[in-house]
């Protein structure tokens, strides 16, 4: 209904991390208007290997989370980056780029205040534990992009997708983690541009 009201005839669907299941379901339900599916470090099956502490975020009060984040911020951008990115090489890629550093800082704070997100956050955790998607029903061109050092969403999720979708391919970014859009943004953009360009051409 939204696409109809906006008079948009076709789309590329992008699903990142926990947004992957929604994008996948859209591609399955509306193949006639989906030019391509982009699965970006996305969940495609049950999320059993969760990172330590992820679920406890929703248990923190707004003040507690603000205090933790503020201490990290006062300690400097280096601390904020190392808090989420374990690989020193990736940390350096972010720190030497002021634009990416500022974007990273904004992303760091994006889950606060948790009180506005708590209900949805906990609902996601519950649903992702027993996630079951009919991946074999995806018929549109599909690309799965994933870093091989992602400890938040294991690369096995993208491998699962690419193994079950006939018209698909997987693009693995070496040395990249779940925050690779800050450290490997150029490589990611190039892979996305190529996928979209190729599938726009093929539709004519």
Please report, for each region that a protein language model flagged, where it lies by residue.
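Conserved acidic catalytic loop of the alpha/beta-hydrolase fold
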Residues: 1-11
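Catalytic active-site module of serine/aspartate enzymes centered on a nucleophile-bearing elbow/loop
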Residues: 168-204
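Short beta-strand/loop motif that positions the catalytic acidic residue
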Residues: 138, 144-146, 150
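Flexible "cap/lid" loop of the alpha/beta hydrolase fold
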Residues: 37-69
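Gly/Ala-rich beta-loop-alpha elbow adjacent to hydrolase catalytic centers
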Residues: 15-19, 23
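Conserved alpha/beta-hydrolase "acid-adjacent" motif
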Residues: 151-157
């Amino acid at each position: 209904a939204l696409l109809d009201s906006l008079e948009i005839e076709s789309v590329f669907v992008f699903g990142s991390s926990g947004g992957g299941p929604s994008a996948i379901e859209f591609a399955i339900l509306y193949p006639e208007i989906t030019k391509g599916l982009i699965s970006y470090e996305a969940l495609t099956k049950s999320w059993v290997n969760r990172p330590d502490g992820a679920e406890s975020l929703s248990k923190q009060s707004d003040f507690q989370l603000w205090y933790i984040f503020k201490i990290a911020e006062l300690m400097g951008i280096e601390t904020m980056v190392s808090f989420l990115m374990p690989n020193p090489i990736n940390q350096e890629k972010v720190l030497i780029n002021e634009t990416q550093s500022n974007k990273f800082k904004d992303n760091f704070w994006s889950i606060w205040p948790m009180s506005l997100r708590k209900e949805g956050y906990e609902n996601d955790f519950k649903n992702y534990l027993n996630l079951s998607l009919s991946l074999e029903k995806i018929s549109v061109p599909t690309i799965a992009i994933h870093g091989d050092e992602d400890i938040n969403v294991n690369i096995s999720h993208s491998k699962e997708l690419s193994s079950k979708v006939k018209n698909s391919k997987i693009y693995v970014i070496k040395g990249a983690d779940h925050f690779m859009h800050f450290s490997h943004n150029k490589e990611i953009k190039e892979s996305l541009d190529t996928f979209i360009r190729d599938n726009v051409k093929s539709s004519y």
